[in-house]
Amino acid sequence: MYKSLIRPTLFKFDPEEIHYFTFNFLRKFCKIPGATSYLKSKFQVKDARLEREVFGLKFKNPVGLAAGFDKDAKLYNELSSLGFGFIEVGTVTPKPQPGNDKKRLFRLKEDSAIINRMGFNNEGVEATVNRLKSNKNVLIGGNIGKNKATPNEHAVEDYTYSFEALFDYVNYFVVNVSSPNTPNLRELQDKEPLKDLLNTLQKKNEQKKRPKPILLKIAPDLTDEQLMDIIEIVQETKIAGVIATNTTISREGLKSENKNEMGGLSGKPLTKRSTEVIRFLSEKSNKAFPIIGVGGIHTAEDAIEKLEAGASLVQLYTGFIYEGPALIKDINQKILEKGL
């Protein structure tokens, strides 16, 4: 029903406006008595064989929602009822910021893709913390970034501020230095600034009574040499793992009229490359750290490929928009079928 009726209707409207409409609809729907139970019965797959223990955390299933969908932690309780094993909120910055000018979100229907240049629009870390106080036992990742106005030489201060503010309210952290939509942000992926940032966060982490896993989210556009640097940095800084991958700046093979819009490309065109990055990291590191696989998962088979390539968990975003919540159930059922 989603692909034949709901999606064609939603796709007639501006993608950013319909995103907020869907948010409000789901929030109101879940307030109806019995609605949450209905969604759980329709989409959740409960089976002990789906449970995963990764970087010291217990996941009820390995399928999560990637950052960017619930930026301000407004809907994580409702979204979890659709069958996700975990929800990643953000990207969150210390101060609120509006992001880039609209229009900044584009559907590429012929490519089953999206281009976004949102620019870390969010209400700031304090607002996110206040909403996470209402968590009803959802496993939460906190994706953190820097404010646009913060120069790179002071970026560490932004990341540590959000880390401290979110610490008691998330289960793991994601350091986002790979979005193409904040000027010069990707320069923080360079070896020395990245080591400095991660070492600083790890020192803060180690001072806590119970440290939290810190993950690094990387771009799909890194060269093999840069990926080898990532492996070295992860092992040297002793962070918990990697999320592979963020959106791409590549436009290879696109057909849609919006293909030349500036921003990060997500969806099916990213499927192959993100899996290649996962496989490279897994093989070259000899599976030294866990990987969350994300990028172009539109079918259960796409998710299986990432798990077989070396991912411990997977995340959805664009595939969730194009395929609907049934995709979560399909993936979990396929994992059981494959015995993974």
Swiss-Prot record:
Reactions this protein catalyses: (S)-dihydroorotate + a quinone = orotate + a quinol
PANTHER family for the chain: DIHYDROOROTATE DEHYDROGENASE (QUINONE), MITOCHONDRIAL, DIHYDROOROTATE DEHYDROGENASE (QUINONE), MITOCHONDRIAL-RELATED
EC number: 1.3.5.2
Protein name as catalogued: Dihydroorotate dehydrogenase (quinone)
GO molecular function: dihydroorotate dehydrogenase (quinone) activity
Job of this protein: Catalyzes the conversion of dihydroorotate to orotate with quinone as electron acceptor.
Ranges that cross the membrane: none
Residues annotated for substrate binding in this entry: K71, N116, R117, M118, G119, F120, N176, N181, N246, T247
Subunit field text: Monomer.
